[in-house]
């Protein structure tokens, strides 16, 4: 019967009623209720519409533009220049007409007249190397911006354009209506920067010993800006931090380089037999059938022989890529090349690595294996990897991603020795950058606006991939305890996750670490694996090859799980609040036939209003003036006549056998010095060493977000109560997490 479930909890009725009445007069002064903690997100979310629905899915009128490219480029290795021509075919799928187009010229961030250096605060450094002093104060600034030679329409007629730093507006001869296409051509060139000196996501690395260069080429062509239902034209300038917003399209790219170079790029290589030797071609075909280990396609001996040649002949590598948002290239004489096949669900792709001999033995041993593992792991949480390959390029000090290709740091010393830190650093960056194929290359969010939408989600999946690759992987992003130093820092130096990319001061913690931690807490602590994984996979599949916004993610996670997470998004993503939940006090109570003096007075008043009040059971607090030492002796709950009579009158023998018989009663007051509302996770340790765990959802704070009480009726005496015993909620102060209070050892002890 229903009474079974509620009977013993009613033991606290009188005490609780009395306490509430006693404190009624001071509630207004002590209770700090902030209803905004659980307020629904209508005030912050965009209104759902026919483009983006309230469920977080694309709406029936959702659209996105298409930009197709035919590109021919040539690399001048002697002078480090790149020359190119392209034809862009742009399709307007918006149900509105366009008067002009915006094209991104991100390379202009390195132009001599770039405004990017002018928006950074700087001071005089106390010490310089000769090279750094010369570059800062003596030499003319490097000019790495685009040199646009022409913009022409499909008939060869010059089109009018205006360049504003990293954006170029092309004026159309007539409006581009819904469903119409326009083709136009651009010719350009630029100086390739030495990124090891100038920094940046693209450029070349020079090897003094053999005189060769290793190129990682990106942002190398004028690229269409995004036009959508949220921003209109996303033509925010590229200042260097906020990365890219790009439409999907199809690419045909011909790349001419010295004949002795080995090259890889986005897309399918169409003329492999023309650029590989017969032996290399044979090895590559073996790699296509090797699912358990990489096959060396271009050997170290072949790479070392090419390093000495400096051929003046040329070769053109021809690529085709479908439904990608961008294109990246890497080329060098120095490259060793290995590959293996990897199956993800119903698709098979090639995992590929290119690296100079300076990367061995580390790269030959690990790179392609971690590429393959990453594809399998990420696909299990999202969708089968849809592209034909994923490439890891070894480039000094790099960590950058493009569709199907990425550049990654990590090399042993000159003697081929490396530490665990070097090894795991390399494995981590490869996993992370390969993972970007999913976010944002396929789930194509606006990086220029919201860095966390790709970096945060990717860092979360990276964490899952790393610990499945090696359970002892020293992963940095994901575990809740790792974000505590950031979240507990000076609030004046923090911004909410929902902050534009160019306004974030602690970029790594804000856009990578904190959102990754938030998602890990959702999965491990708040939603559970089953609900979280289904919702996350729903988001990935809804927005695969589309352009999601933050609201689309937030709404989908709730829509697919039936878990109200508005309180979580508001606290973790829209504020810099931190979590700090502690135990304020613990009071032990004992069953008594006699009320305390205060309760007796309370009951007299109550009985004046309720003459039918029958015999009662009373709870006496240990330490109160009514407490008697004999109350602490062993007893049976049914020794008390009121309880024994009640049970005999209301329960069958079968039901009585199922009743609990608690001997100890505790009231625990939890307080919350931190601003975040979070679940209360409690571990109780009994005097016999056994433990019991309790989980109270975050909604426990909805009526009072400063203090809440929970009661525990136990058969055994409690020796210790611990909040967040596994450190899974990013609680910044664990000194208030224990009862009895424990003194945490200093790192100096």
Model features per residue range: what roles?
Residues 264-265, 565-566, 581-701, 705-710, ...:
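Beta-strand-rich binding/interaction modules
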Residues 102-156, 260-261, 685-696, 713:
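Solvent-exposed beta-hairpin/edge-strand motifs
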Residues 32-53, 67, 319, 351-648:
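Hydrophobic alpha-helical and helix-loop surface patches within well-folded domains
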Residues 86-88, 92, 105-107, 180-194, ...:
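Short, hydrophobic/aromatic-enriched beta-strand segments in well-ordered soluble domains
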Residues 222-233, 239-431, 460:
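Hydrophobic helix-coil surface modules that form long, contiguous segments used
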Residues 113-128, 189-251, 272, 727-749:
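Glycine/proline-rich low-complexity spacer/linker segments in large multi-domain proteins
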Residues 27-104:
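Early extracytoplasmic/domain-onset interaction patches
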Residues 24-32, 72, 81, 91, ...:
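A surface-exposed beta-strand-loop module
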